[in-house]
């Protein structure tokens, strides 16, 4: 997916010859399509494809399904198994386009089972593969398409081979295997020799790959070649789609006039096709190109129109995105107060309809950067610039949840928490009401355009014409709006920061009460911005405050990568690198921590800060964990700070200690061997608890482990786990039998009775380049969402006995009545100070479990490599 521009993206739809309804006409019913009591199957197929040719409003059912269902019935009545399989495939494609993947899979599998010929079976397998691609199951998609390719090759069906290579390319593209995808598109192009439509689809796909890899000239050339072929076959939908992509390529080359020309031509086609969703997308793109070229007024006009259309169609996530883009332009114009109001309105949409993107038709998936979180980040930045710290803290809390939602993407959010929205101040509410009045005509135009042209009354046609001509005056109207006295008064009120303390005080008071119960805790929210670092501090007894640190995002990123390398190398002195980070993250708030008499830091790290444990920062004399207890949180609003743990803890301890498994994880081949120290770890833990169950290796499987986790207050998993940036299914916990549980799978866990989940051999930040830590955030979020109060995870896997030393001490502290946060801190301090009792206990544990020579254990575990990897997420009691 391209990072910048929204387009109808389904290449498969470009390939299939769909019969569009005549411009301006509504989709026919089965009766009107047939014109008689009986109807031939091909007519029903054509009518169904026409019905689904353009994206429908949200909640409008499954376009084309009634026609395909009628065709299925007719095929069965006439004993036509080929038509029956084709009808099932059409139904599967219709379900896929609206995101109903289980229903789509079921139809394609039924088609495969009854397919009477290699051609139809291959088509059915390709349909199945497309659903897997849409669902992110790339290996399954590739397997299905390769089976189809074998069938088409054996039958010497060149069109089937060309289609299949196109679908394979789309799967590889979804998996970001750019070179493999490009090769597949090129192969499809060769196979489609003499077929201009199929060649156009392949060339369009090649342009997408070039665009993703910033080969902009090559992208333009591919799109132009595709356009020639679309025009040769008269495919308006293909022309519209490729023009939209071509506009995106021109935009990235900063050739904004050419981009706007391409968008304008595509817009004209979308209007003749009554494709309102594409029309809204193109208006949005035009607004962005106008904005990038500094043409603020036409940019605002186009974005207002796009927002109105998205709202009318029910695509509320895209509506919110467009409102955010309007906020960007207002911010660039210096209208910060109005920009803040628009950002808050956008966030209100995002929070209200968090699942919207997942139910959009596949062709309408935006290829904009799907980073709704950037709106939260920009709003927090503006609020902090105006010292509106209470509001900024609330937005930062929402930011964490939006970031994890962006990462988890299509993980079911059936139990998503209600965190509220960005609270509007009275003046902002009034501003938005005035704004709504100003842009109301855009909404009216959107409503009228939803009426098919053949069904519009003369008065409606006249009203549309009047509204279109009035678009030229909208700029002046909005400028007049900005200058209105009542607007100026409201903006002045918003500039009075002395009033902001009255906002959202109930939530602040509740948060401060929680901090008081946590041993004088202080909540710290860092916010990484391009030109600086902001530290937001909430203490129990004073208003929130923020401190600005003059360090750029690039400088901080470099310092974090250096720190992570130092922490991972036990033979390197980590103190200089960790002191540099201390100077950025803690030194600016030292006085604030002292004034609050802080003993605990509740930490909500931002972006790559998630890869470096706060407790490992060094002040020149001590590690931070020696001074403060540190607890990480996903978001304050998701954390039950006061939940008291079970006074009679029970433990389920599982380990993978023997064997080796080779796994395909995304594009990586991973070989993972049993952890020789893991058996010692869990055996020692089981001996410490009266109510304990141990699962080793093959017994540590999915059917045995997951159902009984909620029967224990502590779940301890001593096995490989990798949390990596990318797709949620690429982050996983390895089970003892070689199976694995992904972050996606964890959404179904139930852990309501669990106080603590421990993963003692996690790895993050693999590959040496730090991402934004969304996978770490995602793990904490999923565990809390499943009901567990807290989790302990390692940021890197520690071998040679260090984990066992720390875990044994941690559980000893826990059994003595210490809270989870303090128990972990004291265990870490024991390793820092080289507590002899800890080392001797660790040696004895290995002596009891190893019948042969003892492993060569270190003489000291004082390096932060051994003790700082483990972070506590959530409740610390």
Predicted regions and their residues:
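Catalytic-core domains of enzymes
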Residues: 504, 540-544, 606-714, 733-736, ...
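Eukaryotic all-alpha helical interaction scaffolds
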Residues: 68, 75, 95, 112-115, ...
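Conserved alpha-helical positions within TPR/SEL1-like repeat arrays
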Residues: 45-57, 83-97, 120-134, 159-174, ...
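An often Trp-containing, charged/polar helix-loop segment at the C-terminal end
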Residues: 803-877
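Amphipathic alpha-helical protein-protein interaction segments
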Residues: 337-622, 641-656, 660-661, 666, ...
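Catalytic cores of nucleophile-dependent amide-cleaving enzymes
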Residues: 637, 713-809
């Amino acid at each position: 997916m391209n990072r910048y521009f929204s387009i109808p993206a389904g290449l498969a739809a470009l390939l299939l010859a769909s019969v569009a309804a005549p411009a301006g006409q509504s989709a026919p019913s089965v009766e009107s399509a047939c014109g008689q009591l009986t109807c031939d199957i091909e007519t029903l197929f054509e009518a169904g494809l026409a019905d689904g040719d353009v994206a429908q409003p949200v909640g409008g059912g499954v376009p084309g399904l009634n026609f395909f269902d009628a065709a299925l019935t007719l095929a069965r009545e006439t004993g036509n198994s080929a038509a029956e399989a084709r009808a099932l495939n059409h139904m599967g494609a219709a379900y896929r386009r609206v995101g109903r993947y289980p229903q789509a899979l079921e139809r394609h599998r039924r088609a495969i089972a009854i397919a009477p010929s290699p051609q139809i079976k291959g088509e059915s397998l390709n349909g199945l593969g497309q659903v897997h691609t849409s669902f992110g199951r790339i290996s399954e998609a590739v397997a299905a398409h390769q089976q189809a390719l074998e069938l088409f090759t054996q039958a010497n069906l060149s069109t089937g081979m060309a289609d299949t290579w196109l679908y394979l390319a789309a799967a590889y593209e979804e998996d970001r295997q750019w070179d493999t995808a490009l090769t597949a598109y090129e192969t499809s192009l060769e196979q489609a020799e003499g077929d201009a439509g199929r060649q156009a689809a392949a060339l369009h796909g090649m342009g997408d790959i070039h665009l993703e890899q910033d080969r902009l000239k090559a992208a333009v050339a591919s799109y132009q070649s595709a356009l020639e072929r679309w025009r040769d076959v008269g495919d308006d939908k293909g022309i519209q789609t490729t023009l939209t992509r071509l506009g995106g390529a021109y935009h990235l080359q900063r050739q904004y006039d050419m981009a706007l020309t391409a968008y304008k031509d595509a817009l004209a086609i979308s209007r003749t096709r009554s494709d309102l969703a594409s029309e809204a997308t193109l208006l949005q793109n035009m607004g962005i190109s106008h904005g990038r070229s500094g043409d603020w007024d036409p940019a605002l006009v186009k974005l207002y129109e796009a927002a109105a259309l998205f709202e009318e169609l029910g695509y509320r996530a895209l509506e919110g995105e467009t409102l955010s883009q309007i906020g960007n332009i207002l911010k660039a114009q210096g209208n910060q107060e109005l920009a803040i109001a628009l950002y808050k309105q956008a966030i209100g949409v995002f929070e209200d309809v968090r699942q919207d993107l997942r139910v959009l038709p596949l062709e309408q998936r935006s290829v904009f950067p799907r980073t709704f979180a950037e709106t939260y980040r920009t709003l927090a930045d503006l609020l902090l610039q105006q010292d509106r710290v209470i509001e900024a803290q609330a937005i930062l809390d929402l930011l964490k949840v939006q970031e994890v939602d962006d990462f988890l993407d299509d993980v079911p959010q059936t139990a998503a928490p209600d965190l509220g929205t960005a609270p509007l101040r009275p003046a902002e509410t009034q501003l938005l009401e005035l704004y709504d009045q100003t842009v109301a005509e855009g909404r009216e135009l959107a409503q009228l355009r939803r009426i098919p042209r053949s069904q519009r009354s003369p008065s409606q046609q006249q009203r549309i014409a009047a509204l279109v001509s009035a678009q030229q005056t909208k700029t002046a109207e909005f400028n007049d709006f900005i200058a209105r006295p009542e607007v100026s008064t409201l903006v002045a009120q918003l500039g009075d920061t002395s009033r902001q303390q009255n906002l959202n005080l109930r939530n602040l008071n509740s948060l401060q009460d929680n901090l008081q119960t946590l041993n004088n805790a202080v909540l710290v929210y860092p916010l990484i911005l391009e030109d600086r670092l902001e530290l937001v501090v909430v203490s129990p007894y004073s208003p929130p405050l923020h401190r600005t640190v003059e360090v750029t995002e690039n400088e901080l990123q470099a310092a974090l990568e250096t720190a992570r390398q130092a922490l991972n190398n036990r033979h390197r002195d980590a103190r200089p690198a960790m002191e540099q980070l201390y100077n950025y993250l803690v030194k600016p708030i030292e006085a604030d921590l002292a004034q609050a008499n802080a003993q605990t830091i509740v930490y909500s790290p931002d972006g790559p800060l998630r890869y470096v444990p706060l407790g490992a920062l060094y002040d020149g004399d001590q590690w931070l964990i020696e001074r403060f207890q540190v607890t990480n949180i996903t978001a304050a609003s998701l954390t039950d700070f006061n939940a008291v743990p079970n006074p009679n803890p029970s433990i389920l301890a599982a380990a993978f200690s023997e064997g080796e498994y080779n796994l395909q994880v995304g594009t990586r081949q991973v070989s993972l061997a049993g952890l020789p120290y893991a058996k010692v770890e869990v055996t020692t833990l089981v001996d410490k608890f009266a109510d304990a169950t141990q699962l080793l290796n093959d017994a540590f499987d999915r059917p045995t482990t997951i159902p009984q986790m909620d029967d224990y207050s502590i779940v301890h998993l001593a096995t490989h786990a990798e949390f990596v940036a990318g797709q949620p299914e690429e982050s996983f916990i390895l089970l003892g039998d070689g199976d694995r549980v992904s972050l996606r799978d964890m959404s179904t866990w139930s852990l309501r009775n669990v106080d603590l989940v421990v993963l003692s051999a996690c790895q993050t930040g693999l590959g040496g380049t730090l991402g934004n830590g969304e996978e770490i955030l995602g793990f904490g979020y999923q565990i809390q969402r499943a009901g567990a109060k807290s989790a302990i995870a390692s940021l890197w896997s520690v071998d040679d006995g260090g984990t066992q030393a720390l875990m044994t001490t941690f559980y000893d502290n826990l059994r003595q009545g210490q809270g989870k946060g303090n128990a972990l801190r004291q265990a870490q301090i024991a390793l820092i100070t080289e507590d002899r009792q800890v080392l001797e206990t660790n040696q004895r544990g290995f002596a009891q479990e190893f019948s042969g020579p003892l492993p060569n254990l270190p003489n000291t575990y004082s390096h932060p490599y051994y003790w700082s990897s483990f972070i506590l997420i959530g409740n610390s009691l």
